[in-house]
Amino acid sequence: MLRHSSTPAHVVARDLSVDYVTEEGEREAIPGTLRYDPADPFAVELILRPGEEAITWIFARALLAEGIEVPAGTGDVRIRPTRSKGQTVITVSLSSPSGHADLELAKSKVTAFLADCHGQVPAGRESNGIDWNNELHMLLRTRNT
């Protein structure tokens, strides 16, 4: 994880209800949080709390931003705008060796979250505060141990 060295940590977090869409098309509401830490400027977290333990998925902030407008992603995380119950929602499709899940998030909540994120670190400026010499040093140190 690349660390943004000069940005004060103003973490953005937005709680929201996430609809898990079953294979039968039924929806189950799960408490969730979208989280962005400017110290890790390229990533966002989707934290799901279906029970006692939280499940966290980390993926690119740019992927989320693209996915609210057009289908985005080709790997374990795919994001696209869709219609559900007469409104536009953001569908996040997650795949792992243990299974697959389609989740629906309110587009208005995701859009507001991204606006707050871009207020902390504007799109295209994620790497401006990264100490690249330190990152290289850490990579080389890790490789040599």
Curated annotation (Swiss-Prot):
Keywords carried by this UniProt record: Cell cycle, Cell division, Septation, Sporulation
Q: Does this UniProt record's set of keywords contain Cell cycle? A: yes
Q: What is its main location?
A: other
- Name of a matching Pfam family: SsgA
Residue spans making up a coiled coil are none
Q: Report the locations given in the UniProt record.
A: Cell septum
Query: Any one Gene Ontology biological process term?
Result: division septum assembly
Cellular component GO terms, alphabetically? cell septum
Q: Which domain of life is it from?
A: Bacteria
| Function, as annotated | Involved in sporulation-specific cell division.
Q: What family does the entry list? A: Belongs to the SsgA family.
Name recorded for this polypeptide? Sporulation-specific cell division protein Francci3_3418
Tell me which species this is from: Frankia casuarinae (strain DSM 45818 / CECT 9043 / HFP020203 / CcI3)
